[in-house]
């Protein structure tokens, strides 16, 4: 992550150490290990190991395909998870708020409220246009998304 973006993240998020799986912690180059405590299957089925949590190979292939750097990619298990993770990363519970313009995808509100983040709903004006004045009036230093 580039330092110029750090100011947008919650302090507690920046202080976290990246997750390391048991496979990374106990890596042994000399022999293949089966980590039964990680619920790995020692038998040769097609799904006998957990995938790489950092998705290094997948990001590398997508980056090559799209002609971008792999650190420009963020992958999630669908839009619900992505929205939740964005709110967790940027919004301080009980302090910050997000703004939504109904009708919109319901998970913005559900995720924000689940994590203790206030939701300000800004109604549309005629012909489903944004009310930019209302958005600007509702926005302040605690507006995050």
Report each predicted region and the residues it spans.
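N-terminal "arm"/small-domain region of PLP-dependent enzymes with the aminotransferase-like
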Residues: 1-64, 145
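A general structural motif
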Residues: 31-33, 70, 94-95, 142-143
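Short glycine-rich anion-binding loops that position phosphate/pyrophosphate groups of nucleotides
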Residues: 39-42, 79, 105
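Short beta-strand->loop structural element characteristic of the AMP-binding/adenylate-forming
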Residues: 118-124
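Active-site phosphate-binding strand-loop segment of PLP-dependent enzymes
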Residues: 126-145
């Amino acid at each position: 992550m580039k330092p110029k973006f750090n100011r947008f993240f919650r302090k507690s998020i920046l202080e976290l150490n990246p997750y390391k799986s048991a496979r990374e912690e106990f890596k042994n180059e000399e022999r293949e290990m089966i980590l039964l405590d990680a619920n790995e299957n020692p038998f040769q089925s097609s799904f006998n190991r957990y995938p790489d949590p950092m998705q290094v190979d997948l990001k590398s292939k997508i980056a090559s395909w799209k002609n971008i750097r792999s650190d420009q990619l963020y992958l999630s298990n669908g839009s619900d998870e992505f929205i939740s993770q964005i709110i967790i990363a940027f919004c301080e519970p009980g302090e910050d708020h997000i703004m939504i313009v109904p009708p919109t995808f319901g998970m913005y509100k559900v995720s924000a409220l689940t994590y203790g983040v206030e939701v300000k709903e800004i109604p549309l004006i005629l012909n489903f246009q944004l009310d930019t004045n209302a958005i600007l009036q509702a926005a302040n230093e605690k507006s995050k998304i």
